[in-house]
From Swiss-Prot:
Catalytic site positions: 79, 154, 178
Domain of life: Bacteria
Reactions performed catalytically: L-glutamyl-tRNA(Gln) + L-glutamine + ATP + H2O = L-glutaminyl-tRNA(Gln) + L-glutamate + ADP + phosphate + H(+)
Species: Heliobacterium modesticaldum (strain ATCC 51547 / Ice1)
E.C. code: 6.3.5.7
Gene Ontology terms describing biological process: translation
Organism lineage string: Bacteria, Bacillati, Bacillota, Clostridia, Eubacteriales
UniProt keyword terms in alphabetical order: ATP-binding, Ligase, Nucleotide-binding, Protein biosynthesis
Protein name: Glutamyl-tRNA(Gln) amidotransferase subunit A
Length: 487
């Protein structure tokens, strides 16, 4: 039995029937990680010893005849920008290379309470700034479907670990597409929840009004189970929403007949690879065959999403990253003779090129001479983008689009052209600006690589996104395919 091919709910059934132990599952995952890490490089830090201790506790619970929850004993991975008590948390940056937090992020606490077993911390673009993991301060992660291609970013390690069978599920963060884009590139499920639905306490901030934590899973049911564990109000996060949260599995398997589905004309224009377009059109036809009513809609202001995002996100980043000064924690340059020089050298030596670029962009946008012309104007257009979605959702239940305009690109293809790199998130940025949920599922394949279908919903309507995604998954079976890694 190849345990690494199983989903969380399949492993749960095996545990309940005592056909396998949690320790066996963890050892299988550890062997898989050891065999694949030289090739995939998804992890920054491994925590297998701690995972085995956690698994032993789950086995003892089962042996005592106690009931276990759907995630108990299930191996997971955590993106390395979420604090983990006693485990190094680097943001894949030299400036935090030796930072060990004294507490867990709320999502980590919740998953531990749910009995999930952490196998390690995954690689990312430094401070979550990037779309390929090529900006990691340590190494680039490879796409399990083709190791010469990127896994996407910034949560590339989290997506690759699930696609390769190194983790059953993982957590990522999404500021402009950093869950959905790598999910599309790696052929897994990736959900960016509504802003405020999942606590950001313990997430190392990039852009605080845009950041959101969400899951990567191999199928939609697993995604629902992880959301049940991590969603909910948290008093430690002032932006956490005090609303009623549903059972995210409750609508799975229910029909979508009569649903009104919108296709934004702005998302189906120039720039999309013809083969990707073909896969998406076929996916839309499948949704129609399932009984949904599909019609064109318009999101006119989303054409400004890219410049709006690259004014707001760097502005917030320049403020958030001001704390890395070499004084309180993190890297400190030892070659400085005075305090000001120490600040300058610490940041010059500790940050990578993309992080420096975005700090400079943000500082420029916030400077007194340009604040009104750039930053404030971007905030106003952000409101117009949100209004576009509000108006569309008066007529439609969900909106469908490609997740990305192309399949995963090869290493080095876009490193010398930042704008081309930024354009890989062109279909995902608006969802963050509007604060609404977006889900990417595998729609099929083009050029032998996965293609993502993005499903966008109303605020706090994640359960219905999962419902339509589950219906599509059941109709196509695309989620069941795994890359052949020769192990």
């Amino acid at each position: 039995m190849k345990l690494y091919t199983k989903t969380a709910h399949e492993l749960h059934d095996l545990l309940v029937r005592k056909e396998v132990s949690a320790t066996e599952i963890v050892k299988t995952q550890a062997d898989r990680m050891q065999a694949l890490e030289p090739k995939i490089r998804a992890f920054v830090t491994l925590t297998v010893d701690k995972a085995l201790e956690q698994a032993a506790r789950v086995d003892a619970k089962i042996a005592a005849g106690e009931a276990i929850g759907p995630l108990e004993g299930i191996p997971m991975a955590i993106k390395d920008n979420m604090c983990t008590d006693g485990v190094r948390t680097t943001c894949s940056s030299k400036i935090l290379n030796n930072f060990v937090p004294p507490y867990d992020a709320t999502v980590v606490t919740k998953l531990k309470e749910a009995g999930a077993v952490m196998m390690g911390k995954t690689n990312l673009d430094e401070f979550a700034m990037g779309s390929s993991t090529e900006n990691s301060g340590f190494f680039a992660t490879c796409n399990p479907w083709d190791i010469e291609r990127v896994p996407g970013g910034s949560s590339g390690g989290s997506a690759a670990s699930v696609a390769a069978g190194q983790a059953v599920f993982s957590l990522g963060s999404d500021t402009g597409g950093s869950i959905r884009q790598p999910a599309a590139f790696c052929g897994v499920v990736g959900l960016k929840p509504t802003y405020g639905a999942v606590s950001r306490f313990g997430l190392i901030a990039f852009a605080s009004s845009l950041d959101q934590i969400g899951p990567f899973t191999r199928d939609v049911r697993d995604c629902a189970h992880v959301m049940n564990a991590i969603a909910g109000h948290d008093a430690k996060d002032s932006t956490s929403a005090p609303v009623d949260y549903p059972d995210y599995t409750s609508l799975l398997g229910k029909p979508i007949k009569g649903w009104r589905v919108g296709l934004p004309k702005e998302y189906f224009g120039d720039g999309m690879d013809p083969e990707v377009k073909e896969v998406i059109e076929k996916a839309v036809k499948t949704i129609e065959d399932l009984g949904a009513e599909v019609a064109e809609c318009s999101l006119p202001h989303t054409e400004y999403a890219l410049p709006v995002y690259y004014l707001i996100a760097p502005a917030e980043a320049s403020s958030n990253l001001a704390r890395y000064d070499g004084v309180r924690y993190g890297y400190r340059s030892e070659s400085a003779d005075d305090l000001i020089t120490m600040f300058k050298k610490t940041r010059a030596e500790g940050f990578g090129d993309e992080v420096k670029r975005r700090i400079m962009l943000g500082t420029y946008a916030l400077s007194s001479g340009y604040y009104d012309a750039y930053y404030l104007k971007a905030l106003k257009v952000r409101t117009l983008i949100k209004n576009d979605f509000d108006q569309a959702f008066e007529k439609f239940d969900v909106i469908l689009s490609p997740t990305t305009p192309t399949v995963a690109f090869k290493f080095g293809d876009r490193t010398d052209n930042p704008l081309q790199m930024y354009l890989s998130d062109i279909y995902t940025l608006s969802v963050n600006l509007a604060g609404i949920p977006g889900l990417s599922i595998n729609a099929g394949f083009a050029k032998g690589m996965p293609v993502g279908l993005q499903i966008i919903g109303k605020p706090f309507d994640e359960a219905r996104l999962l419902q339509i995604a589950y219906a599509y998954e059941e109709a196509t079976g695309c989620h069941s395919k795994m890359p052949d890694l020769g192990v």
